[in-house]
Amino acid sequence: PSSAASDVYKRQIMRRVQDAMPEREGIKALDIGAGPGFFSIILGMAGCEVTALDRNPAMMAEAKKNAGPLAEAIHYVEGDAEDVPLPMGSYDLIVTRNLTWTLPHPKKAYASWQRVLKKGGILLNFDANWYNYLYSEEDRALYDRDREQVAEAGVFDRYISTDVMACERIARQMPLSPKKRPAWDRQVLEEMGMQVTLYENISEEILLPEEQLNFAATPYFCIEAKK
């Protein structure tokens, strides 16, 4: 990750960890859907004891490469985010980013994450209402406005530069695409007995101005859930 992005997320995560667990030391952290290791590296730099979980072995190899010297201190586990193959009550902190919306069984995933958290541990889930515009005329209008404003500003369009139709086909198969989030997540987590705090728009805190323009209609949120 870039130095600027790492610093921003590190501050976001560690501030909330300190608020939720002010007296806890030696934080055991689990990065679920670790991908290329963005969060794993940040957590390692922050002094956490880190486990990185991903189902893709090629991505695990990339994460190790990206971590450099930190890789020796990170425990890499190949496994399913919906059925985490780790002991019950073993982590103080779980972090995940841009993952939940892609899961076929998000309720199952949340239950699995709760299982591996220690009592008093916290989940920090960074995500957004990706592709909700497929199910809402109002959101579609806001999405179209974003594309116009990005073009007018002459900045790189992060949607048009991708295979939008392919991404939309995938999104239509995902159960969370039509849901209003993070309200949906709050309800599910509270029904499981978690204490939930929502930060419904943190885009200004974690995105560059160009990114904020691209995703104005789809702000990043953070779900903090304490066991």
Residue ranges and their predicted role:
Residues 93-106:
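A short SAM/SAH-binding and catalytic strip from SAM-dependent methyltransferases
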Residues 1-5, 9:
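Single conserved hydrophobic/aromatic residue that forms the stacking wall/gate
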Residues 176-193, 198-199:
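Short alpha-helix
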Residues 209-227:
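Core SAM-dependent methyltransferase catalytic element
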Residues 30-32, 36-83:
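Class I SAM-dependent methyltransferase SAM/SAH-binding core
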